[in-house]
């Protein structure tokens, strides 16, 4: 596999793709490169094309930083589907859900900074809370992963606290949290009970029509312990998110109300709402 380019590599790729595109003086490729961690060369080419299309659509002579910002959201979060008809009730649920993610992400230390929160449907999601890492990360600390579990659970917790019910909207969050917790236990040795061991060995079985299958190399008793540890980690994230959101219920209400009114909030706007400005 080809590794994803680092910040210098991304700047170089952007230079190549923008060489034939007119840019305004305020466009700084270095800043765009810094704000696109994890982007592949193809993603960056797509970003430049999208920004150029946006500028052309708005009859601009050159591409601006705003065009790049909007294009980045499109590449990262999917295309806006404003034509999708959503009931007021569903919109309200989505606002609480995304406000829950955003508030937990903002209140926990050592997490990736918030980039944007929206309740405009994008791709297959009804809303999106986007975080952007400050710099390249190749390894993750245990605490960072603990916090990530709480952030993933924030949406479901907010629904329960504010609406007193659960929806299927948290399905993907739950899947991602369970997968992360399983890796913490089975691959990264981050469970005190299970110790620094790998459970399950990956074997290539491409010829059988499978890419990778996890081969079980442990007893049924160990399998039960693994399941318990995974559950403990995910429920730990759930409990932390619930506690944070209950303590800051008023801010949660204000944040979801602001989302209902404005549909999209950037990092500064979220910060101001949390600070009560």
Please place each PLM-identified region on the residue numbering.
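Conserved C-terminal "switch" segment of AAA+ ATPases
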Residues: 2-69, 74-79, 152-160, 187-197
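Short hydrophobic/aromatic segments of transmembrane alpha-helices and their interfaces
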Residues: 12-13, 25-27, 84, 234-235, ...
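Short hydrophobic/aromatic residue motifs in ordered secondary structure
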Residues: 43, 100-101
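Short pre-active-site segment immediately N-terminal to the catalytic Zn-binding motif
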Residues: 83-93
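Soluble catalytic regions of large protease machineries
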Residues: 93-96, 102-277
